[in-house]
Amino acid sequence: MNSKSREFIVSQDWLGVNKIFFNQKTGQYSENVGDLIDYSNFEFDSEGLLTYLDFGYCAFGKTPIKGISFLEQNQTLYFDEDGQLEIVNNDDPSINYIETISSEENTWEQIESNIRSFCDKNINKNLCVPTSGGFDSRLINFFSPRKEQIKAFSYGLSSNPEKSFEVIKAKNICEKLNIDWNIVEIGHFNKFITQWIEDFNISSHAHGMYHYEFYTKIKEQNNIMPLISGIIGDLWAGSTSVSEISSPKDMINLGLTRGINFDRKFCLLNKKIDSYEKEFEEKKDLLKNSRYRIISLIRTKIMLLSYLIKVPINLGFECSSPFLDFNICMSMLTIEPSRWENRKWQRDFFMKNNLDLSHLNKKSSYRNDLDFNSMILHPLDPLNVNLLSPIFKESYIEWINKNIVSSRLDLRVLHWLMNTKYLRSIFPKLGINDKSLVAYNSYVVLKPLEEILKRVKQVEKK
């Protein structure tokens, strides 16, 4: 077809931080899928819904809503000469890099230059650096040219935040670098669930509310300031790998769900739908390359992970990250494999620059009580059984509602045991899990669906 006969609508870039959802008939598009939903003519898409349940967020161009899709990376949406929508796959620039080897020295120079440039651009302002003590925020703080410009903020995961490993490491780093460091206490973030669904709708599960509380408190106490994020730096740097993908069912390996999804066996729809056949066939040869699998993992999960900068942006912060820059990302990914694996190249850099914190591991708490305690501090409204039971097993919805009440003594004891040093690895092998957190993870996947169904019912009553 002659390209001149096409009418350009919108195009997605190489990474997809800014989502592009679109109506399959009209071509109307928006970053918020909620803008496109017709509640008076609503129908779930079975394949898209099952994909959402499996991943905990939308994946592979599908959404749970019939007639609404999203553009994947390097795709352009057109009207063809007959006025029909057409998706065109553009060249993928990352493919040119997956067989190359980059220079560590050059990679460090690129990261430093990016951070310095943003700091210089905001030379007369304080800069917010969310600091976990992990590698990415550690590098941002280290490469910031004027330490007095930085205000670092951390939160802890355990019931005693000041003993959390993130907080101890962040405080130590900031003391070494003479950076103003602050701890932000969070825990009431479930009150932001309505705001989350308003901003992200059905694009992902409702599990990022803690960032709304975190940045809201920073904003209230310090006003808005430019922010440098370490978003996805760990994935480019070698923190994880993706096992081989040899069949459609292996495509779930690109999800990195960390348990925040919903078991499709509790869904009443046809669960035998093979949601991933098309995606596997299109990319199976490229997915033989371990680096391309990392790229695909990041591109898949960016549907969710983009909230790491979208939440502060929604609250008024100007955000930047070196780890969203194409050249930096490709340089990090293509470090010599033996140096890239487990981030050895970064570990050696920290040793060389007196930023190694491994000696603090035994002095820190690795408990994660954040979600559990949030259900006590701000109890969740039970899921609407009547609304959800036509799609999901009623008994399981009732089980979720029962076990999100984490103030129950039996659930508190179980959670404490599950986080005890010697039991946390034994219990899962015995089939024992932290019931309240399993319920919480299922809840946050279903809650955006419930909100859509509520709006459908409201429209029906009019």
Features from the language model and the residues they span:
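Glycine- and acidic
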Residues: I95-S102, A152-L157, W196-F200, K310-G316, ...
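Short catalytic/ligand-binding loop motif for oxyanion handling, primarily in non-cytosolic enzymes
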Residues: V17-F21, Y97-I98, D136-L139, N190-I193, ...
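Conserved adenosine/adenylate-binding substructure
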Residues: N124-L127, N190-S241, K272-C319
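Generic recognition of stable, solvent-exposed alpha-helical segments in well-folded globular domains
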Residues: E72, N106, Q110, F135, ...
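Adenosyl-5′-phosphate
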Residues: I68, N253-K462
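Cysteine-centered catalytic environments shared across enzyme families
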Residues: M1-E185, D199
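Short hydrophobic alpha-helical segments that form membrane-spanning helices or hydrophobic packing faces
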Residues: F21-K25, I140-F142, A237, C329-T334, ...
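ATP-dependent adenylate-handling ligase core
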Residues: S158-I218, I231-G255, D285-L286, L333-P337
